[in-house]
Amino acid sequence: MEYRTEINYEKIKEGDALIGMRTQGIDGTHYPIIKVMLDRRPDLLHAKIDEEHFLLEEMMKANVAYTREIMSLQECGYLHGAFRVHNSLFRNKGWRELPDGLYACVDMTKIPVLPLFRFLYEQDMIGADVFPHRFHMGIGMVVAVPAD
């Protein structure tokens, strides 16, 4: 099978399901914000964010390359579109690629927030209203697939 098929958004249609794919790492756009937080509170660098994790080790986790998942969805004919989430679910250029007349709704209550992002949020250094517009909350890619 030829895997060089371009992923575009022409196949996305009303009723498709949008699935957020988990990433363990933070995006490169998050580092400047975290650096400002650490400049204000250097003690956070070695802080324990939950029973098992420290901030520094969580910051060092790599983002996921979704190659296997994307290729599998393409091979089955299920992939209608996909975009990488940089910075934020809300401020993502991928939403602009939806076909004319289609819109997406993100239910933030359905996203299980990783301990790293919960910890950063609880530091309350950038404001609760701003936080979801600056961090991807652990969703690294969104794929559009048939709802059934």
Task: Report residues per predicted region.
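Generic structural "secondary-structure junction" signal
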Residues: 3, 9, 28, 40, ...
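Glycine-rich anion-binding loops of enzyme active sites
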Residues: 1-31
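Surface-exposed beta-strand edges and their flanking turn/coil or helix-capping segments
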Residues: 8-10, 32-36, 95-97, 118-121
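Glycine-/charge-enriched secondary-structure boundary and capping motifs
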Residues: 52-58, 64-148
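Glycine-rich, acidic
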Residues: 26-72
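Short, surface-exposed linear patches
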Residues: 16-22, 40-44, 104-106
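Secondary-structure boundary elements
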Residues: 10-13, 40, 75-77
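Short, solvent-exposed coil/turn linker segments
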Residues: 2-3, 25, 43-44, 54-55, ...
